[in-house]
Amino acid sequence: MQLKHLRTLLSPQDGAAKVTCMAWSQNNAKFAVCTVDRVVLLYDEHGERRDKFSTKPADMKYGRKSYMVKGMAFSPDSTKIAIGQTDNIIYVYKIGEDWGDKKVICNKFIQTSAVTCLQWPAEYVIVFGLAEGKVRLANTKTNKSSTIYGTESYVVALTTNCSGKGILSGHADGTIVRYFFDDEGSGESQGKLVNHPCPPYALAWATNSIVAAGCDRRIVAYGKEGHVLQTFDYSRDPQEREFTTAAASPGGQSVVLGSYDRLRVFNWSPRRSIWEEAKPKEIANLYTVTALAWKRDGSRLCAGTLCGGVEQFDCCLRRSIYKNKFELTYVGPSQVIVKNLSSGTRVVLKSHYGYEVEEVKILGKERYLVAHTSDTLLLGDLNTNRLSEIAWQGSGGNEKYFFENENVCMIFNAGELTLVEYGSNDSLGSVRTEFMNPHLISVRINERCQRGMEDNKKLAYLVDIKTIAIVDLIGGYNIGTISHESRVDWLELNETGHKLLFRDRKLRLHLYDIESCSKTMILNFCSYVQWVPGSDVLVAQNRNSLCVWYNIEAPERVTMSSIRGDVVGLERGGGKTEVMVTEGVTTVAYTLDEGLIEFGTAIDDGNYTRATAFLETLEMTPETEAMWKTLSKLALEARQLHTAERCFSALGHVAKARFLHETNEIADQVSREYGGEGTDFYQVRARLAMLEKNYKLAEMIFLEQNAVEEAMDMYQELHRWEECIAVAEAKGHPALEKLRRDYYQWLMDTQQEERAGELQESQGDGLAAISLYLKAGLPAKAARLVLTREELLANTELVEHITTALIKGELYERAGDLFEKIRNPQRALECYCKGNAFMKAVELARLAFPVEVVRLEEAWGDHLVQQKQLDAAINHYIEARCSIKAIEAALGARQWKKAIYILDLQDRNTASKYYPRVAQHYASLQEYEIAEELYTKGDRTKDAIDMYTQAGRWEQAHKLAMKCMRPEDVSVLYITQAQEMEKQGKYREAERLYVTVEEPDLAITMFKKHKLYDDMIRLVGKHHPDLLSDTHLHLGKELEAEGRLQEAEYHYLEAQEWKATVNMYRSSGLWEEAYRVAKAHGGANAHKHVAYLWAKSLGGEAAVRLLNKLGLLEATIDHAADNCSFEFAFELSRLAFKHKAPEIHLKYAMYLEDEGKFEEAEAEFIRAGKPKEAVLMFVHNQDWEAAQRVAEAHDPDSVAEVLVGQARGALEEKDFQKAEGLLLRAQRPGLALNYYKEAGLWSDALRICKDYVPGQLEALQEEYEREATKKGGRGVEGLVEQARQWEQAGEYSRAVDCYLKVRDSGSSGLMEKCWMKAAELSIKFLPPQRSLEVVRVVGPQLIGIGKHSAAAELYLNLDLVKEAIDAFIEGEEWNKAKRVAKELDPRYEDYVDQHYKEFLKNQGKVDSLVGVDVVAALDLYVEQGQWDKCIETATKQNYKILHKYVALYATHLIREGGYAQALALYVQHGAPANPQNFNIYKRIFTDMVSSPGTNNAEAYHSWADLRDVLFNLCENLVKSSEANSAAHEEFEMMLLISHYYATRSAAQSIKQLETVAARLSVSLLRHTQLLPADKAFYEAGTAAKEVGWENMAFIFLNRFLDLTDAIEEGTLDALDHSDFQDTDIPFEVPLPAKQHVPEAQREEVRDWVLTVSMDQRLEQVLPRDERGVYEASLVAASTGVRALPCLITGYPILRNKIEFKRPGKAANKDNWNKFLMAIKTSHSPVCQDVLKFISQWCGGLPSTSFSFQ
């Protein structure tokens, strides 16, 4: 360590002004200096002077300079300073935590001599030395001081060890004494340790030794037991003077001694175990060092001098900067200061064992410290300043550190996991595991304290991939092991360590309860899971569902909600918990129920104060009330009475709250007076017992304390007089008689005649008691009393009076007893019979009326049957000789033997129908013989056979069956038995059974199933010889598949399928077997093909050798070529048969030609010496160029043939010129001539003949003339030519006739030209009549070939306007037609328009038709189903047209089930008051109210649309002739209903309006004539159930179930209306045609209703209001007065009415204000829309500051 001067804190003076003492505070923030003036100066850690205060003398009369301060020390909490003074006193000053706080003396300790030195090592403990030689202890808590030990020598120095647990004092005689408060297990001795040569004014206690020095200028280091380790002798150094003071570093690794102008520094070397002197710090004019103080973190040393100066030095071995963020200052070998450069915070890292710190790392997001020493590992949390040091043997730096848990560091090394809790110097534990993944390890360290559990530390980790172990880290033992069937990929304990969650590779989530060791799968697909921080609430994701378990103790109760993305995290703060979900690019927060989370957690932890604080932040709702009740119960159980009082106050239980308040006052007073727990006081315990209605316990508590009066007062206050009197009797209380009188008087005053009668009876006054009993309506008690007293029986009037009362009260048995007692048997018997007291009646009848006994026995039996006592009834029926009833009773009572006994006594007809019932019982007991006998007696032998069949007793069944069954039934029986035999492996027996019943196919199937093929073939051959071959083939395939080839061969060959056998062996590579089979069974060439395939598989010379061996080489070459395996054929020919190559080339060429590979084929043809074949190939494919190239190169004789072929192709393409040239090149003009003739091209034929074959010219001309004559001389060209000749000759009429005769279907242009020419000639040169005829002929012909314009032009030339227009129309040239009509004959304009409309209609060109005829266009749109275009077009027309088509479209949509789109139409276009539209509006309303999924907040806009349309309709009706009609009233009612639905949807979007929504659902029940009744009652019932109105919910849901049954039955006749008497809920409603609620929800309701009715905790009555009628009824049944319904809830307005401008419209003020408040707090747009509508509907809102903006 080196000292570096930093600054001068206090400048020295010119003379002696000694700094007497100095001290650093424990928290390193304050430094105190006491000057010679007895003033304490206070500095901050940076050396700035911040404060000062003066010390005071023990007694002011001696003056301020009467003492010196000799010792000073800070308290461990750094808020106090102890000052030791020479005037025999120690003062303790409280200086506070902040600068400038007032300095107050809080302790003072007066001593018998001067204080010479002082230390404050521990809380409340100040150690100081006195001039008289004593070392004493001052306790600041008790303000007393005591002597630790005493010597006879002045105490010159006092110091402590590093931990402050030991003290060392130096005395003037050189003695050094050691004392331990706690030796920390070191075993070091106490007492006098060493005798130093001089007074050890400089005394320091380092880690490994004690350093002492004094005026002899020697420094001596002593060992732990006082032996000298080292001596540093400076006595011969003239520069050195005496050593005045010494200080050890806080780490104990360095010592500094002060002398004159010099500070000497010694450092301990751990490796050499000796002190090494560093270079001394010499400062001129420093003078004598009088005081030294070392900062607690070891980074600063301050020295005070004789002249009053204070110098500050920096102490450092070395410094380094870590990642430019932290400064590491090594102030000693075992101590490092880590400073955060950005925040300035510092942490002191120190080895408590003095080991040298080797390296410091800052890991885990720069929060955690890790440092190694030779034998330990240092860990720390920079944020919380929690540091740990554990024993750690060097492992080569291979450790892996995980800092995911804020409380624990996880260290993984060589397969071992070690856990270290920050702030603890022992490892929590270590386990073996190979899985070091933070997701596979979970540690919980006191994360959530629970009541009664102080320490809770648990670890869960993977032992292997499928095994989880759970360890209690406190006890170090295993508390659970979970073996799972698949790999675990995530696990985590809850914060209390009671539950473990884990997920496996199949994404299944499991919950393990550590206490019960039970494992539950709670989710079958889990992509995200996390515990909610600070609770046991669990959040997980299952595909598109968010799952929340608010109560993990009930894992089956999960709250699920739909989400559209992936959960990415949880955020908890600000009083809410949110689940963050990414939906696309956005993150959406889903809020959890904070009440369930916070309250549940507080209750689980037993933190009732936290639970109370949370509940006080909530509004009082049914849920909150339930929480208060739970808390009140738990608080009482835990005796937290103030919490319980608060709970009952919140619940409005005033009496209980007041009672607890008084109890708390008693407990608090007792606690104040006597201390301890006030709840243990007897009055408190008794009052708590009273609160729990345990009055006996309260009495016991009072009597234990002899508080008899208090016990009696308690009972009297509770009006429990009997108990009060019993206490008085037990304790002999003097007021006993008075109590009894008061009790009787009280009973009479409170009309408790029964109790008064009992009191009189107990006191012996019978008449008075009877009188009181009768007065109380208790004649039975009176009768009992009379029967016990003979003297009272004698009083006939009294007895008559009593019997009359008994009969009136239907107490017939007691009346009978009385009549029998007074000897009136007739009346007694009547009473017994009426009271069903048959035993007494029969006994009386036997004595008095024997004839009646039989009748009474039967009646007795009937009564017992009604009471379900069938067993008892049997004997009575036998006595009454009622056999049938006796049998029925015996059967009902399951008295089978009695039943058989009775049956055996009856005739056969009577007994036969009962025997089977008894037989069934014995069959169920497997007593088959008895059952058979009974079935037989009852003529039910078939049932006996069925019994034996079901029991597997086939022999008995068969024996019976043969007696009574048909053959087909026996067959079924046998087959069943055979199947049973087959299951048992008895195949032969099964076969015999199958064959016996002529079912051999079943036997065949059985043998096949069990692979007994020989038996199978045997049966097929015997029973199905025609299928034998197919069976062999099928078996062969199966055996081949199983690899049983020899057996397969047998079956294939038996099936004559040798090819299948060959293929089987081939595919298995057994070629010899294949060849053998082919040769033996395959005919002449089969073995050759197999040989070819075998050889091909071998290839090369091996193939040649094989084929030579088989003698099939040449044949195989041919076979290969024939099978297109040319490569193999060439290979074989090359190796053995070269002369076969041309033949193979030719076959190959032909193959290539077939494949279309002509160039390759050409080469092969040439190689085969067949060029002619190549030429023919190309000619065939008309590749003339290639054909000519090959012919010229290899076969010149074929050139002419190629040219002729090419010419033929040209002729086929009508290219006569090219064909002519080719034929002439081939020197074949004759062929050209023939081709022209065949084509009818006589002119070309004549030309060719003339040029190349002139000798044939004459004959050709003759032939041509013959042809012309055959065709009538009128070929097209001939006609045209003839026409031209007539025209040139001036014969225009004949020319016209010729032109008109031209018909050439191939040339419309020629025909047009000719016909136009004819018309032109006729107009120019022929008479008008003739020209008109020609034009009338030409016009239609031109139109026929599509030349409409030309025809029209012709017609116009002759003024044929209509014909011209018709031509344009037919040519669809409408503009020209219109122009002609307009310009030449306007009469035809309408004619053109009409045709144009028809054209557009026929063509479907509606867009064009719109401009001509809108209505026709709209109708066409409707026909085509183009509704959108129809409505869009109609919108541009008048209102009437628009709504005609809107109605048509709406009707269409409704038929298609699209009521929502129909509604949207009327939202867009308005709802006119047309009567013909009324059914549409009603249908939309009906469909909307019947549709599912509309009872939620999301349906608001649909309901609002319906409401707005009906409002618009009603407004229009008011202005129409339909105003105030029945239809108008009906639509007004529909408007009100739709307003209720819309308001309900709006209210469902806000939590605080849930009761409003429920009330609206209830109000809608009065409109069930217009709504589906089952849906309305279901919605009302579920809404009532959700808000806790269980009575209403039960009645409505019960009604709903009745309605669903009525729908099933198709009638409402069975409905019970008693629950709805005196309400406005209608009885007569339309029966819904179908169920509107799904089956699953109906069953859920059925279960709930059944559960509630079984509990019998609800009263089946609708709630009533102040009118005494059902609270939601508008009509008061008693008065008939009808209240207005509230616009917000639909409930009747009885008071606090807010009226609107529109008559009949009002709201309840409370509901209205609640609705407004909800809008203001939530800013809900839908609720604002409701208000906006109410404003429109009701003519404005009441005066309010609410705004829609």
Curated annotation (Swiss-Prot):
<feature type="repeat" description="TPR 8">
    <location>
        <begin position="1042"/>
        <end position="1075"/>
    </location>
</feature>
<feature type="repeat" description="WD 5">
    <location>
        <begin position="195"/>
        <end position="233"/>
    </location>
</feature>
<dbReference type="GO" id="GO:0008589">
    <property type="term" value="P:regulation of smoothened signaling pathway"/>
</dbReference>
<dbReference type="GO" id="GO:0007219">
    <property type="term" value="P:Notch signaling pathway"/>
</dbReference>
<dbReference type="GO" id="GO:0008544">
    <property type="term" value="P:epidermis development"/>
</dbReference>
<dbReference type="InterPro" id="IPR056168">
    <property type="entry name" value="TPR_IF140/IFT172/WDR19"/>
</dbReference>
<feature type="repeat" description="WD 9">
    <location>
        <begin position="521"/>
        <end position="559"/>
    </location>
</feature>
<dbReference type="GO" id="GO:0021915">
    <property type="term" value="P:neural tube development"/>
</dbReference>
<feature type="repeat" description="TPR 14">
    <location>
        <begin position="1574"/>
        <end position="1607"/>
    </location>
</feature>
<feature type="repeat" description="WD 4">
    <location>
        <begin position="150"/>
        <end position="191"/>
    </location>
</feature>
<dbReference type="GO" id="GO:0005929">
    <property type="term" value="C:cilium"/>
</dbReference>
<dbReference type="InterPro" id="IPR036322">
    <property type="entry name" value="WD40_repeat_dom_sf"/>
</dbReference>
<feature type="repeat" description="WD 7">
    <location>
        <begin position="284"/>
        <end position="323"/>
    </location>
</feature>
<comment type="similarity">
    <text>Belongs to the IFT172 family.</text>
</comment>
<dbReference type="GO" id="GO:0048596">
    <property type="term" value="P:embryonic camera-type eye morphogenesis"/>
</dbReference>
<feature type="repeat" description="WD 8">
    <location>
        <begin position="483"/>
        <end position="520"/>
    </location>
</feature>
<feature type="repeat" description="WD 6">
    <location>
        <begin position="238"/>
        <end position="278"/>
    </location>
</feature>
<dbReference type="GO" id="GO:0007368">
    <property type="term" value="P:determination of left/right symmetry"/>
</dbReference>
<feature type="modified residue" description="Omega-N-methylarginine">
    <location>
        <position position="672"/>
    </location>
</feature>
<keyword id="KW-1017">Isopeptide bond</keyword>
<dbReference type="GO" id="GO:0031122">
    <property type="term" value="P:cytoplasmic microtubule organization"/>
</dbReference>
<feature type="repeat" description="TPR 10">
    <location>
        <begin position="1276"/>
        <end position="1309"/>
    </location>
</feature>
<feature type="repeat" description="TPR 6">
    <location>
        <begin position="947"/>
        <end position="970"/>
    </location>
</feature>
<feature type="repeat" description="TPR 12">
    <location>
        <begin position="1411"/>
        <end position="1445"/>
    </location>
</feature>
<dbReference type="GO" id="GO:0060348">
    <property type="term" value="P:bone development"/>
</dbReference>
<feature type="cross-link" description="Glycyl lysine isopeptide (Lys-Gly) (interchain with G-Cter in SUMO1)">
    <location>
        <position position="4"/>
    </location>
</feature>
<keyword id="KW-0007">Acetylation</keyword>
<dbReference type="GO" id="GO:0045879">
    <property type="term" value="P:negative regulation of smoothened signaling pathway"/>
</dbReference>
<dbReference type="GO" id="GO:1905515">
    <property type="term" value="P:non-motile cilium assembly"/>
</dbReference>
<keyword id="KW-0488">Methylation</keyword>
<dbReference type="InterPro" id="IPR056157">
    <property type="entry name" value="TPR_IFT80_172_dom"/>
</dbReference>
<feature type="repeat" description="TPR 3">
    <location>
        <begin position="809"/>
        <end position="842"/>
    </location>
</feature>
<feature type="repeat" description="TPR 9">
    <location>
        <begin position="1142"/>
        <end position="1175"/>
    </location>
</feature>
<dbReference type="GO" id="GO:0070986">
    <property type="term" value="P:left/right axis specification"/>
</dbReference>
<keyword id="KW-0832">Ubl conjugation</keyword>
<protein>
    <recommendedName>
        <fullName>Intraflagellar transport protein 172 homolog</fullName>
    </recommendedName>
</protein>
<keyword id="KW-0217">Developmental protein</keyword>
<dbReference type="Pfam" id="PF24762">
    <property type="entry name" value="TPR_IF140-IFT172"/>
</dbReference>
<feature type="repeat" description="WD 3">
    <location>
        <begin position="110"/>
        <end position="148"/>
    </location>
</feature>
<keyword id="KW-0966">Cell projection</keyword>
<dbReference type="GO" id="GO:0009953">
    <property type="term" value="P:dorsal/ventral pattern formation"/>
</dbReference>
<keyword id="KW-0802">TPR repeat</keyword>
